[in-house]
Regions:
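Gram-positive cell-envelope targeting signals
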Residues: 1-70, 239, 418-426, 433-446
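Serine endopeptidase catalytic core focused on the charge-relay Asp
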Residues: 215-389, 393, 402-403, 411, ...
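Signal peptide-directed extracytoplasmic domains
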Residues: 129-156, 163, 203, 207-217
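A short glycine-leucine-enriched loop at secondary-structure breakpoints
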Residues: 159-171, 192-194, 390-394
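Conserved PDZ fold ligand-binding element
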Residues: 89, 162-184, 400-403, 407-412
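Interdomain regulatory linker/hinge segments that flank or connect interaction modules
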Residues: 32-39, 87-131, 309-358
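PDZ domains, with a preference for the canonical peptide-binding region formed by the helix
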Residues: 95-101, 174-203, 417-419, 423-428
Length: 446
């Protein structure tokens, strides 16, 4: 009996140990799973940190001559500065220079762990300039480079444009080797073909030069190809500023687009002319207001050479009407100098009467170089709100001043709240002005 009970006790003890071992095994298995999951979370977190660091690094940087360039990265992400011939000038975990004194572009390559290139960063160093804020309503006459296709329609039940590849927004520049500069030239050239196929050279929206052919259709006494075209555009806006050293100027802060295609108009030439303000249509929620004006019987103030997404650029020839002086010149602020809070806009709402009005800079999108919505602004001046309801069409280009410097220009109004809108940085306007090929543009417009 003693032996039996001893055996029973041993058996129970072994069973308890087995249970304990099984429990320990389960706990170890659970612990390993927890460790594995934590490891995965940590790895994903590290990847997320690296992705965020690379993503938030801007693809392009605009800075003023003499400013400090600081681009810091985390461990494992290196920056290489390349020379004009592609040679590596500097490679480090950060690019820190006391001052960048040379105007031009710096090309930086972002590498991961010294081998995998993940991003390019372009640094454009622009000159520090003084400009004369204008804020005057002016007229603009733009003449297209070629004729702009704005629509298509059947001719006698036929579609000569079908399968030609031409789309709305394209520009026709030649027909049968004859240069096309305006709608009259296109009409005459097509009419002279006698119904024979014509070879058309056109420029697509992405600036690719292409050729195609169409067979005109006779309708009445004329031949037509079923394309609606336009060769000019006109409107009223605000002249932002000019550089007193060379009389180069910018207006609008945004580009002029075609009314039918909503695409930026590629111009061959243009004119800045005087405008006569007729009335102010007050803006309200859901319905933007407008400065109503005319450019009839106007005289030329200057020439337009470039229409870009960031404004209309040209040169001034007659400054008397602007009612400004070179003594009014101010520095263009870098975006780093701009602060949220009070600022002023300068605009003309009555003929010959320019005035400053108080606004608020609500938000600054400091890394935004891709469009003309650099700052969110709000009209706070009660007099301006009483006159216009806020920002209205025709005020685009009104210069914005803060702490004695030009910081930008008005570009957009928020439809649901006309007291709010967007503005573009002044340094972007200077950068765009510097990037215009003035020699080529002037030659093309002559």
């Amino acid at each position: 009996m003693m032996t039996f009970f001893h055996f029973k006790d041993n058996l129970k003890e072994n069973y308890n140990k087995l249970e304990e071992n099984v429990e320990n095994f389960k706990q170890n298995k659970i612990s390993k799973k927890i460790i594995l999951k934590l490891s995965i979370v940590i790895v994903l977190l590290i990847i997320f940190i690296y992705v965020c660091n690379i993503s938030f690094m801007p693809e392009s940087i605009i800075m003023m001559q003499g400013e400090t360039l600081n681009i810091n990265t985390i461990l494992g992400i290196n920056l290489e500065q390349q020379g004009s011939n592609g040679e590596i000038l500097e490679a480090s975990s950060s690019i820190n220079k006391n001052k960048v004194n040379e105007v031009g572009k710096l090309d930086l390559k972002v590498n991961l762990f010294g081998s995998l290139q993940v991003k390019d960063v372009s640094v454009n160093v622009i000159p520090k300039v003084k400009v004369v804020p204008v804020g005057k309503a002016i007229g603009m006459k733009l003449y297209t480079d070629g004729v702009l296709v704005v629509g298509m329609s059947e001719i006698e039940g036929k579609k000569p444009y079908e399968n030609s590849g031409i789309e709305e927004g394209d520009r026709i520049i030649e027909i049968d080797d004859s240069k096309i500069s305006n709608t009259d030239e296109l009409i005459n050239t097509v009419n002279n073909c006698g119904g024979q196929p014509v070879n058309i050279t056109y420029v697509s929206e992405d600036e690719e030069v292409l050729t195609t052919s169409m067979t005109p259709v006779k309708t009445g006494e004329d031949y037509k190809i079923g394309l609606w075209v336009r060769d000019a555009a006109a409107g009223v806006g605000t002249l932002t500023f000019y550089n007193p050293e060379n009389n180069k100027c910018v207006a609008l802060g945004h580009g002029i687009t075609d009314i039918d295609t909503s695409k930026l108009i590629n111009i061959a030439s243009g004119e800045l002319v005087s405008a006569n303000i007729l009335s102010i249509e007050k803006g309200e929620k859901g319905k933007p207001g407008e400065i109503k004006g005319t450019i009839e019987n106007s005289y030329t103030i200057g020439k337009v050479y470039k229409n870009t997404a960031f404004g209309v650029y040209g040169t001034l020839e007659n400054k008397q009407i602007l009612n400004v002086s070179e003594n009014d010149a101010v520095e263009v602020a870098s975006r780093e100098e701009i602060k949220t809070g009070k600022a002023e806009i300068l605009c003309e709402l009555e003929n010959g009467k320019k005035q400053k009005y108080e606004i608020e800079i609500e938000r600054i999108f400091i890394n935004n170089n891709s469009d003309n919505k650099s700052m969110l602004i709000k009209i706070t001046d009660t007099e301006l709100i009483e006159k216009t309801g806020g920002i209205i069409q025709g005020m685009s280009g009104a210069p914005i001043l803060q702490n004695g410097k030009l910081i930008g220009a008005v570009t957009h109004v928020l439809v649901n709240d006309p007291t709010e809108g967007y503005a573009v940085f002044g340094d972007i306007l200077v950068e765009q002005m510097s990037s215009v090929d003035w020699v080529k543009s002037i030659a093309n417009s002559s």
